[in-house]
Regions:
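A short beta-strand-loop-alpha-helix capping motif that often carries His-Thr
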Residues: 116, 194, 240-244
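Short, charged low-complexity linear segments at domain edges
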Residues: 138-162, 187-207, 259-263
Length: 291
């Protein structure tokens, strides 16, 4: 696709099933993410979020090319390049402008992981993959190392068929998690998830949580997945490791990280979600495991 997306699909607007969301919330698996308890109706019924919604277009873009840099960095691969929220929104707005130039009555809102919208579920309905045992969307070609973006519009479309779940009996992702965060039915206990603890949890890492070297995010269950091992290698230039992030990683490794290094790296990176003191706390917690 000209704008750089590797896949897209369309789903008819409707009401999503809420059983998994209810189970996740009722068990407290959302940890301190209290915002997940709000706007539940909007998460389930897209028309409460976008009243004119008729079609949800889902788009995927792969970052399956920077695993070498991520492997020993302690930073999840998705965070090594530009901030995907900003990059994908620009692409979607460019696409929207193109469509509206041809169809002036085309109305749409675009979303990139920033609203009460269940991106993975809509991507499944759009035929772009299935939900793996680790809760991630798995695409048959690109695996689960993809970013998801959505455009919700007032036009109807030809709709895609859902794919069958192809995880089979594999439990590699479940068995790989050092903290046993992966529960049945693709549900994640955030309290025990390295990604949650190093990003969303603003406090210190609790005792008993093993980071295995990670200081921002985690790729352990993704690396274990057989679909990622055979996924097509593709990485958009936007998501190639930036010099600032590579410098940050070097400074973390040699113990010389300073706030100015962090500030330079966070300007265009997803790591802006954490404060400097939180990253230092994560580094100390990870280091304490090997001391």
């Amino acid at each position: 696709m000209r704008l750089g997306f590797q896949a897209c699909g369309a789903a008819k607007a409707g009401i999503l099933k809420s059983e998994r969301l209810n189970l996740w919330l009722n068990n407290g698996y959302h940890a301190a993410m209290e915002y997940m308890e709000r706007n539940k109706e909007k998460r389930i019924d897209i028309k409460q979020l976008v009243p004119y919604a008729e079609t949800i277009f889902s788009f995927l873009i792969s970052y399956n090319g920077n695993q070498n840099e991520a492997a020993q960095s302690g930073v999840a691969a998705y965070a090594l390049g530009e901030d995907y929220h900003k990059v994908l929104k620009i692409k979607l707005y460019n696409l929207l402008q193109i469509i509206q130039s041809a169809y002036p009555d085309f109305e749409a809102r675009v979303f990139v992981d920033s609203a009460p919208l269940m991106e993975r579920q809509w991507a499944v309905k759009a035929g772009l993959g299935w939900i793996g045992k680790n809760g991630c969307l798995i695409n048959r070609t690109f695996g689960s190392r993809t970013f998801i973006a959505e455009m919700v519009c007032n036009y109807t479309s030809d709709y895609c068929e859902e794919q069958k779940n192809r995880c089979g009996t594999s439990k590699r992702c479940i068995e790989s998690c050092p903290n046993h965060a992966i529960k049945p039915n693709g549900i994640i206990d955030s309290n025990r998830c390295i990604s949650y603890q190093t990003i969303e949890n603003k406090a210190a890492i609790p005792d008993g949580i093993r980071l295995q070297g990670y200081v921002y995010g985690c790729d352990i269950c993704l690396n274990a997945c057989i679909w990622n091992k055979k996924a097509a290698k593709y990485q958009a230039e936007d998501f190639a490791p930036s010099p600032e992030m590579l410098n940050l990683i070097d400074k973390i490794k040699n113990g010389s990280l300073e706030k100015q290094d962090f500030n330079k790296a966070r300007k265009h990176s997803p790591i802006e979600r954490v404060k400097y003191y939180k990253l230092l706390s994560n580094i100390n917690a990870a280091q304490s495991e090997v001391d």
